[in-house]
């Protein structure tokens, strides 16, 4: 069974450690176990750093980075019992900071380093932890920040979901899984 939590639908904020703990406990109580945890939460505020309100910066770091830490720490005991898998999401901007989204790019880079480090720490516990790195994807967050773009220039969310599911079926850990648009004509 799949359980979904979000700020909009369930008022669950990954930046709030207690809310993460409550969400995971509710799933474990209902299902008896947790095999996989996938965290896609992210905030992109596309504006110059010098123009950003400090509270906006803190909220982005709290969601993007501390949300990752919260989910990992709170999911760990459940995933230890099932030798489960944990997936986080980065962005192609993690490899090179980009003007007007310095906080987003830097928190996404931090997620990659976090995943690689924690994968080594938790390998003996049987927990796999990986990071999905989709290229520019057609999402509401993207549209909010960049407007309407031609579909052929964007990765479709379904392709990202398929790559995520394929990753759950592997034994890899500590990896960054790049997801790209299919080549023209494929």
Question: What do the predicted segments below correspond to?
Answer:
Residues 72, 107:
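Active-site helix of classical SDR
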Residues 40-45:
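Conserved NAD(P)H cofactor-binding loop of Rossmann-fold oxidoreductase domains
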Residues 96, 117-127:
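Active-site-adjacent segment of SDR/Rossmann-fold oxidoreductases
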């Amino acid at each position: 069974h799949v359980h979904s939590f979000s700020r909009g639908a369930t008022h669950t904020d990954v930046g709030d450690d207690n809310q993460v703990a409550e969400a995971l406990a509710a799933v474990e109580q209902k299902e008896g176990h947790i095999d996989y945890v996938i965290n896609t939460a992210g905030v992109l505020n596309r504006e110059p750093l010098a123009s950003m309100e400090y509270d906006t910066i803190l909220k982005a770091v709290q969601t993007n980075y501390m949300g990752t830490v919260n989910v990992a720490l709170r999911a760990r005991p459940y995933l230890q019992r099932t030798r489960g898998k944990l997936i986080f999401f980065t962005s192609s901007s993690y490899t090179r900071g980009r003007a007007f989204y310095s906080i987003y790019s830097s928190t996404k880079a931090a997620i990659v380093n976090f995943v690689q480090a924690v994968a080594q720490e938790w390998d003996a516990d049987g927990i796999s932890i990986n990071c999905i790195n989709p290229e520019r994807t057609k999402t509401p967050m993207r549209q909010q920040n960049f407007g309407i773009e031609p579909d052929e220039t964007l990765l479709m969310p379904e392709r990202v979901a398929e790559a995520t599911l394929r990753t759950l079926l592997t034994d890899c850990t500590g990896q960054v899984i790049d997801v790209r648009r299919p080549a023209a004509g494929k």
